[in-house]
């Protein structure tokens, strides 16, 4: 899928925590959120990330108030910039430990879509894109890594 001129790449990733965020078994994940988010913010190609009052998104409850549902939403200049962050930084190690902290999702949990440069998506907008991907599969409206032929790093890690 070609990137439209004047657009950036938005992504939403959701997951259900195995335990409450305050549970000691979640400490390695929760205690490193600021570190990993800070790393993302310093990466070439990073544009923006959603934050709630916690400074991350750990307190956002978009799914019927479920305290164990977590979201991550960000905007990047392009798919390559996002892929380099996800697969070529310490983030990859945390992704590799995801089963320690997150339940296995039965359905899609990751979506990407193009946004006009300068647009900051809302959580509701992102959830609507994820729902669209679930219902209709990849399209110009909502897609996954397979729709970005230039971004190949995900193939070795089997993301989304």
Positions of the model-derived regions?
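Short S/T/G/P-rich N-terminal loop/turn motif that feeds into the first structured element of a domain
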Residues: 1-69, 108-160
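Short, hydrophobic/aromatic alpha-helical segments in well-folded domains
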Residues: 32-36, 71, 81, 94-97
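Helix-adjacent hinge/juxtasegments
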Residues: 60-87
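An amphipathic, aromatic/His-enriched active-site/gating alpha helix that lines ligand/cofactor pockets
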Residues: 79-107
């Amino acid at each position: 899928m070609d990137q439209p001129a004047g657009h950036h790449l938005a992504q939403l990733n959701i997951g259900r925590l195995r335990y409450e965020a305050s549970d000691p078994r979640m400490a390695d994940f929760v205690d490193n959120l600021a570190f990993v988010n800070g790393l993302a913010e310093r990466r070439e190609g990073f544009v923006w990330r959603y934050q709630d009052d916690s400074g991350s998104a750990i307190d956002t409850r978009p799914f019927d108030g479920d305290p164990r549902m977590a979201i991550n939403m960000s905007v990047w200049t392009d798919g390559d910039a996002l892929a380099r962050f996800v697969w070529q930084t310490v983030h990859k190690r945390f992704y590799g430990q995801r089963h320690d902290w997150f339940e296995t999702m039965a359905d899609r949990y990751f979506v990407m879509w193009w946004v006009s440069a300068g647009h900051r998506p809302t959580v509701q907008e992102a959830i609507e894109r994820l729902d669209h991907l679930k219902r209709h599969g990849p399209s110009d409206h909502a897609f996954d890594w397979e729709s970005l032929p230039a971004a190949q790093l995900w193939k070795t890690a089997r993301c989304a």
